[in-house]
Amino acid sequence: MKILGISGGRKDGNNDAMCKEALMAAKEMGAEVEFVRLLDLDIKYCTGCTACVGSLMTGKGNMCVLKDDFDWLLDKMLDADGIIFANPIFCKGAPSLFLTIRDRFGPRMDRGNNVVATKIAEATGGKAPDPRILKDKVVSYIGIGGSDWVTRFQCDSAIQALTPMWKVINNEVFPWSTGIVVDKDKVAKIHEIGANIATAAQDIANATYKGEEGVCPHCHSRNFYLDRESTHAVCCMCGIEGDVKILDGKVSFEFPEEHLEHAHDTLSGKLIHADDIKKTVAISMELKKSDDYKQRLENYKNFITATKPQR
């Protein structure tokens, strides 16, 4: 059993410390542990080139054209049974470096895409994606903030797990925590998070969420896109559509059972999404052949060029 701790904070700061606290607990449970600091790595932004999708869907493996430390980090993550992220909270949510990793995960690491790509490779004799991508894994997120501006963090984090369909064990926010290293109660909670993921990693198939219950009964998110003229709502994490209810002063979110197959963190939902994208891409490719499209694009291209600094 191997647990990887990933800190998104500065060297020897609160996030490093709390990530290591969780790893200490995991080690006590018998886990092999490893620690990585994101700021030590060269991680480039995803450019949206979709070369990864092209390689997946043509039996050429799972490739990214960017040359940096991402594949090194990805290899560490794929080798682990469980992962702990400890991130600072910036602008109410997860920091940009973590969000960049999240962007680099999708669609390259999407479970649905890799299931389809594996079948394509088997049928054509091509190169299949790394089989570790289809391996179940558990993950926990720790967010450390200096105030109560923290309301986006849990959703930002869980979307990273959504892509490869990893099981979220804890997704915890610690507001007002600039002094967390000497806060015994919070340190104890971090230690518990480490123990929880080590336990979950020993039996991933039966592992369950151990955090505080959220509003969405499926993914525990508290973030929703609301319809101002009705009770209709969409969960910002799993994408399930339903209705917000208030009973005895408490908020709940209810949805028809058949909507569950559309959830973005389920394989059925991912395959539905892949089919939707396939259709829109086909339409786009046809449009790009038209003279009208080519002329419009040329007009925009010639209107103005991007200003860049002198190097």
Task: Give the predicted meaning of each segment.
Residues 32-35, 165-175:
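Short beta-strand elements in bilobed, periplasmic/extracellular small-molecule ligand-binding domains
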Residues 62-159:
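Helix-loop-strand module that forms the ligand-binding subsite of alpha/beta enzymes
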Residues 36, 94, 112, 171-172:
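Residue-level detector of family-conserved "landmark" positions at structurally sensitive sites
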Residues 1-86, 90-102, 106-107, 198-311:
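N-terminal beta1-alpha1-beta2 submodule of the flavodoxin-like/Rossmannoid cofactor-binding fold
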Residues 129, 135-160, 165, 174-218, ...:
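Catalytic cores of enzyme domains
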